[in-house]
Amino acid sequence: MAAIEFEGKSYEVDEEGYLVDLTQWVPGLAQIMANDEDAVLTDAHWEVLNFLREYYEEYQIAPAVRVLTKAIGKKLGKDKGNSKYLYELFPYGPGKQACKYAGLPKPTGCV
Amino acid sequence: MADFETPEIKEFIGIPALQEGSMAHSSPFIAYTDHQEALGYPGELVENWQQVALDKMDDLRSRYRSFQVFLDSCVKCGACTDKCHYFLGTSDPKNMPVARQDLLRKVYRRYFTFAGKYFPKLVGAEDLTEAVLDDWYSYFHQCSQCRRCSVFCPYGIDTAEISMAAREIMDAVGKGQKYCNEIIGKVFTVGNNLGLPGKALANVLEGLEEDVEDDTGVAVKFPLDVKGADILLVTPSADFFAEPHIDGLIGYAKVFHETGASWTLSTTASEAGNFGMFIGSYENMRRVSMRIRDAAKELGVKRIIFGECGHAWRIAYSFLNTLVGPFDFLDQSYPIPQHILEYTWGELEKGTLRINKEENDHMTLTFHDSCNVARGSRMGDYPGGQFDYPRNVIKAVCNNYVDMDPKTTKEATFCCGGGGGLLTDDLMEIRVKGVLPRATALKSVVENEGVTHMAAICAICKSQFTKTLPYYGFTMDQIVSVHQLVSEALVMKGSEQEAELDGTDGDDTEE
């Protein structure tokens, strides 16, 4: 399996670049993963990633799209509480791309 | 990410010029050892895999008479060749249903028929080699088991059953598909395909209660694990997570609320989907189904209703009683199980729901028949009910409705391109190419009839369309759930919408 090297440590990732051992996640990994997709993480991205981390710690899964948009809307204003805004930040899909950077498991199933 | 060419969308669905081997590179990720073992399969390719595969094939033909008949009866008439959406989208001749079947049939002939044993070349019989196994893995994961080809086959050969058997054989030798097998494992450990734990499910449902109350002023409940409720609703876990699925879930809840139904969801049976069917595994399909029976018993419900999920409804309608019946503990005066559309249409017919169709006037709808509902089940008590019920409900809540080309609807419907366990990112190319026939039919009604939105009743269809139709110039939000339309038009008693309509809200609204 592939691995990411970061600060002298090796992190195993799966075929799509998701972290295999989720407990290993450190914030610095997010930008390393984003580099592969030519993305530069800004504060706006980190607002989302931080929320994902908090939600995951409590519920052991990524939030539903609706839960995420509602939370972002509450925090950053109504104009940003929609999937359009999230797709601008994470064009490959907020659920999947953002989850990868934040070290969350990939949502599976009919989604 | 997308390093393939999106096919050109034309005015009509045409037969493409053949491009041999153009999809031979398409293969899904292989299941990990732990995914395999959790389902009772070997963790990796076993050493004597040829013998294991042939033994499994022998076992399957003795268990399923249909499988044997399908392998024997093809006369190569060619009626199926241009009926598969994956062939039409990829131009790869191995995606012609007959060619797909022959990948298995040639091995069957070699080892199980007289002619194939002694004169293999004369009858197209071939040895089971590693190259053949690789071909199986590739092309049996380019079949969504939608059964469109079988409608046109004069012998009724069902490629889906052959494809399911092939996957069962591959699982038996230790070469399973990651997407399906990982997900089935999650159903056993967490309770649903998504891996959504009970606490998270409760959080989603609470959030929805808040949202609906904010929108309507009515306290609509989304009950979870309520013992003694009348109805257990079993719905795809995507309904708790994805868009536009979740808008459909809101629709079910509003309908239940408005009709005064006592209902509940279950954390242990929080999934209608059953990928055991996709991998052709009776044992896994049964084990997944058992959760529903167990939950129904434990909660003491009288009825089971299924939400908008295509293959779940095929299993529910056609197989559930065989798999985990009898359901003699349920109220026998209702269909066992029942589809949410049967429930909603029944209530609309009775007149218990007040509808303001104008709420959906900004849209012109069309409807995508899901393959497993169209060709593997029924709604109501007459043939073809599964085509009428969704359309009846849409027309009852929307003023503007147009059907797509009849060659692409009802029993001739095209698969969305993501069914049968292919709804995974590692198969994006085949998914994008496979949606081409549906996209073509949709484009025609968009351009000629002013259609703006397409409604669907399957979680896979909804996800597949929102991800792949944008490759052809459509937008994600053009896909809607049928119960989302119901939700928009339903005027609940005591709601803000009711007050506004009746002019009793005290506001000076102009419109």
For each of these PLM feature ranges, what is it?
Chain B
Residues 230-240, 363-374, 455:
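Short hydrophobic beta-strand segments
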Residues 336, 340, 346-395:
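C-terminal amphipathic alpha-helical segment
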Residues 1-138:
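Ferredoxin-type iron-sulfur electron-transfer modules and their immediate structural context
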Residues 156, 240-330, 374, 378-385, ...:
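Cofactor-cradling patches in redox/metallo enzymes
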Residues 74-80, 84, 143-149, 153, ...:
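Short cysteine clusters
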Residues 171, 292, 322-330, 344-360:
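Extracytoplasmic substrate-binding proteins
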Residues 61-71, 101, 105-323, 503-510:
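Iron-sulfur-cluster electron-transfer modules
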Residues 82-110, 151-170, 378-381, 421-435, ...:
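Iron-sulfur (Fe-S) cluster-binding segments and ferredoxin-like electron-carrier domains
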